[in-house]
């Protein structure tokens, strides 16, 4: 068995040497790097084993680096198995996979023979198989027999076609199976006939040798007979003869010694002649028999040649049947795919109708959205102008509010003085009533009454002068303008709500600022008073209130920071969801384009007239509009939310900065060092908040 395997390996190697390759391929060491095998596969099927695949095979995998050789062999073997499964629809489950490590390390001939066997199967099943088969037929008969045995082994190890469709398994399977069985029987009969032909040719050669020897003997005997006849004639002519002793024996007469001697010699020669004639007849019979055998052998050889020609025709027919069977399988598979594609096409038609209806609605929505976008673009510049005007008005309002607070504080002080004077007046009136009895006391009471009246009149006049009528008119006018601006912003409801919230916070902060200014003025007034006990009590109350206010401010600041962090996290989440949505839209777009391309191919394959009638570009445009319209409302909602949050953050930060700066200005002027130290530090600027 090992000898047969080695013969098969050398036969496959001799066949592989006939290929025209640039790489060396004369022995196992040169084939172990896989480069020659890859070039051969590229020559067999260039459409599958492409030049880019061939470039992956490293030409430097020679010498002692067996790992590079093994990497090349792995690529070649994997591509071979893929070719058998994908192109030829064959499975190699029962075929023993070649051990690539033995080939790479030791150049094992048995494993290399399996690999060459797979390459041979690829050669006889490729598009140029006829030329390779003729090259194989041009080799020696022994090599042809070994190559045929290798192909039969490849077929007998389970090299079967892949799964057939149910419709073609009855017809195509029976035809191909019968053709393969007839081919195997014919190949076996051809082998037997070839062996018988070789044996008969050997016999003919041996008989020809024997016949030549017998003919040589015949010619020798004829020459000897001629010599004897010539000698006999010469002896008959010579009447006198000389004996051995030189004495004449006399004439040849009956009864003489010479006559008897010659008679005896003649009898011996006749016997020899009869024997030679018998041998000649035997040789003639043998020659006739050999000629008849030779003619019979020639007839058998002609019959064998005819049978071999029939076998070749049968092989060609089997190849044609195989190709037709493969084409039938491919056509059936294509038919099934076309049926599925036709069903998909009908579904796509229905979907296209639905999408066209949707697209009409989306076009209307898109037009509305474009009008809204134009209106928004027009109002955006106005909003910026209004923002600047609002900031200027806020600054003016803060200045006026500070003045108003001072005036109100002065008014309260004057009112308190007025109340004190009224109380003093009442007490003086009571004293006047009590001290009316005496004239001196009446005069003194009258004088004091006049001074109280003058002080009251002066206080009333001062209080009337200190009333902020212009300031109140200006504040009302500013509020009316602010309200008109809010109403004039159109459909910007979210921004209006944010502005209202900001205004409410601003009013709340103004109230707090007002109370703080009142406390500051009261503290300054208390500091100017002379009573130390009242001063200490008021200082303690004010310090306590300021500490509470500071704690409230810090809590509000922490809440604002946490709210800002939550807004930032929401913005990040929205950005990530937006990016994922864009990726989904891109994937859907690519999938849609593939579906449209498949639909075009199906329509072209079914009916090219219908394919020409359909406007694929319009369909694609409608689908793209549908996808855009589906994604646009969601994006507009996201943008609106992001804009509202950004505007809210900007307004809050700007309001905080403005309040802090005003507090710092109001608290820093006209205060003592200790009073300034008790105040809370201003918040960070907007740029610092943004940087965080």
From Swiss-Prot:
InterPro entries: CH_dom, CH_dom_sf, Hook_C, HOOK_N
SUPFAM superfamilies assigned to the protein according to its UniProt record, in alphabetical order: Hook domain (SSF116907)
Coiled coil: 135-576
Keyword Transport included in the entry's annotation: no
Domain Calponin-homology (CH) positions: 6-123
Alphabetized GO MF terms: dynein light intermediate chain binding; microtubule binding; small GTPase binding
Biological process (GO), any one: cytoplasmic microtubule organization
Cell location: Cytoplasm, Cytoskeleton; Endosome; Synapse
PROSITE patterns to which the protein is assigned, alphabetical: CH
Keyword terms: Coiled coil, Cytoplasm, Cytoskeleton, Developmental protein, Endocytosis, Endosome, Microtubule, Synapse
Region span, Disordered: 161-180
Pfam family, any one: HOOK_N
GO annotation, cellular component aspect: centrosome; endosome; microtubule; synapse
Keyword Cytoplasm: yes
Function as written in the Swiss-Prot or TrEMBL entry: Involved in endocytic trafficking by stabilizing organelles of the endocytic pathway. Probably acts as a cytoskeletal linker protein required to tether endosome vesicles to the cytoskeleton. Involved in modulation of endocytosis at stages required for down-regulation of membrane proteins that control synapse size. Not involved in synaptic vesicle recycling. Required in R7 cells for boss endocytosis into multivesicular bodies (MVBs). Has a role in regulating adult longevity.
Oligomer and partners: Homodimer. Interacts with microtubules via its N-terminus.
Family assignment from sequence similarity: Belongs to the hook family.
Domain notes: The coiled coil domain mediates homodimerization.
Name of the protein this chain belongs to: Protein hook
Protein species of origin: Drosophila willistoni
Gene name of the encoded protein: hook
């Amino acid at each position: 068995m090992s000898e047969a395997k080695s013969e098969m390996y050398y036969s496959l190697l001799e066949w592989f040497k006939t290929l025209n390759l640039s790489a060396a391929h004369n022995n196992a060491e040169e084939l172990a790097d896989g480069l020659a095998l890859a070039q051969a596969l590229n020559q067999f099927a260039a459409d599958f084993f492409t030049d880019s695949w061939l470039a992956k095979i490293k030409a430097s995998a020679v010498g002692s680096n067996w790992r590079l050789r093994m990497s090349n062999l792995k690529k070649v073997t994997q591509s071979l198995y893929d070719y058998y499964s994908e192109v030829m629809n064959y499975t190699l489950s029962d075929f023993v996979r070649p051990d690539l490590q033995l080939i790479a390390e030791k150049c094992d001939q048995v494993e290399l023979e399996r690999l060459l066997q797979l390459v041979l199967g690829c050669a006889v099943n490729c598009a140029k198989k006829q030329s390779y088969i003729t090259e194989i037929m041009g080799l020696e008969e022994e090599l042809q027999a070994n190559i045929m045995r290798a192909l039969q082994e490849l077929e007998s190890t389970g090299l079967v076609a892949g799964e057939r469709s149910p419709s073609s398994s009855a017809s195509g399977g029976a035809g191909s199976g019968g053709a393969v069985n007839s081919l195997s029987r014919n190949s076996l009969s051809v082998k037997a006939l070839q062996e018988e032909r070789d044996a008969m040719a050997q016999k003919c050669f041996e008989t020809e040798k024997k016949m030549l020897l017998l003919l040589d003997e015949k010619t020798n005997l004829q020459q000897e007979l001629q010599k004897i006849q010539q000698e006999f004639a010469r002896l008959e002519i010579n009447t006198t003869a000389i004996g051995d002793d030189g004495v004449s024996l006399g004439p040849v007469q009956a009864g003489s010694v010479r006559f008897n001697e010659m008679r005896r010699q003649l009898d011996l020669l006749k016997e020899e002649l009869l024997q030679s004639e018998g041998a000649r007849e035997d040789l003639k019979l043998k020659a006739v028999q050999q000629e008849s055998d030779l003619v019979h052998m020639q007839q058998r050889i002609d019959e064998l040649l005819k049978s071999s020609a029939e076998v070749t025709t049968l092989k060609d027919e089997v190849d044609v049947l195989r190709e037709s069977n493969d084409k039938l399988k491919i056509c059936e598979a294509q038919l099934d795919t076309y049926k599925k594609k036709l069903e998909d096409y009908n579904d796509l038609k229905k979907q296209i109708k639905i999408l066209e209806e949707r697209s009409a609605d989306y076009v209307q929505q898109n037009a509305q959205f474009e009008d809204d976008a134009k209106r928004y673009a027009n109002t955006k510049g106005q909003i910026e102008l209004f923002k600047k005007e609002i900031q200027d008005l806020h600054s003016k309002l803060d200045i006026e509010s500070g003045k108003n607070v001072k005036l109100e504080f002065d008014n309260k002080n004057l009112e308190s003085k007025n109340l004190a004077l009224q109380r003093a007046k009442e007490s003086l009136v009571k004293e006047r009533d009590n001290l009316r009895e005496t004239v001196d006391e009446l005069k003194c009471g009258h004088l004091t009454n006049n001074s109280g009246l003058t002080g009251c009149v002066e206080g009333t006049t001062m209080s009337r002068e200190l009333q902020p009528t212009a300031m109140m008119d200006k504040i009302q006018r500013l509020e009316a303008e602010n309200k008109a601006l809010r109403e004039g912003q159109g459909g910007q409801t979210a921004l209006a709500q944010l502005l209202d919230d900001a205004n409410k916070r601003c009013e709340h902060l103004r109230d707090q600022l007002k109370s703080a200014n009142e406390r500051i003025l009261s503290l300054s007034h208390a500091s100017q008073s002379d009573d130390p006990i009242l001063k200490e009590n008021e200082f303690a109350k004010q310090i306590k209130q300021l500490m509470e206010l500071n704690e409230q401010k810090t809590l509000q600041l922490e809440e604002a920071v946490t709210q800002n962090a939550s807004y930032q996290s929401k913005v990040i989440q929205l950005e990530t969801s937006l990016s994922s949505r864009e990726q989904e839209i891109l994937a859907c777009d690519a999938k849609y384009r593939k579906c449209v391309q498949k639909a075009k191919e199906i329509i072209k394959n079914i009916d090219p007239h219908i394919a020409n009638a359909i406007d694929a570009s319009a369909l694609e445009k409608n689908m793209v509009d549908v996808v855009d319209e589906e994604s646009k409302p969601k994006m507009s909602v996201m943008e609106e939310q992001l804009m509202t949050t950004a505007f809210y953050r900007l307004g809050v930060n700007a309001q905080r900065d403005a309040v802090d700066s005003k507090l710092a200005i109001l608290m820093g002027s006209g205060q003592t060092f200790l009073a300034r130290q008790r105040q809370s530090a201003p918040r960070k600027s907007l740029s610092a908040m943004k940087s965080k």
